[in-house]
Amino acid sequence: MAKSGDIRVTITLECTSCTQDSVYKRFPGISRYTTRKNRRNTPIRLESNKFCPYCYKHTIHGEIKKRD
């Protein structure tokens, strides 16, 4: 069982262009990736360039807030 103050945390990356266009219902869904990051080395929110299957192109995926 992981400690609550663990350095490595599991985060979710979400497509930024899909979330902006989801208001207008242009795409059928929102692309999400899960990964792990080290809180000590990367204290700020992580952004990565990933492929979005709904936009059919590489877009910036940003870290989203964890919902428990």
From Swiss-Prot:
Transmembrane segments: none
PROSITE patterns attached to this UniProt entry: RIBOSOMAL_L33
GO MF entries: structural constituent of ribosome
Pfam family, one: Ribosomal_L33
SUPFAM superfamilies noted in UniProt: Zn-binding ribosomal proteins
Gene3D superfamilies: Ribosomal protein L33 (2.20.28.120)
Keywords, sorted A to Z: Chloroplast, Plastid, Ribonucleoprotein, Ribosomal protein
GO biological process: translation
Taxonomic superkingdom: Eukaryota
Alphabetical list of InterPro entries matching this protein: Ribosomal_bL33, Ribosomal_bL33_CS, Ribosomal_bL33_sf, Ribosomal_zn-bd
Localization (cell): Plastid, Chloroplast
GO cellular-component term (any): ribonucleoprotein complex
Family: Belongs to the bacterial ribosomal protein bL33 family.
Full protein name: Large ribosomal subunit protein bL33c
Originating gene: rpl33
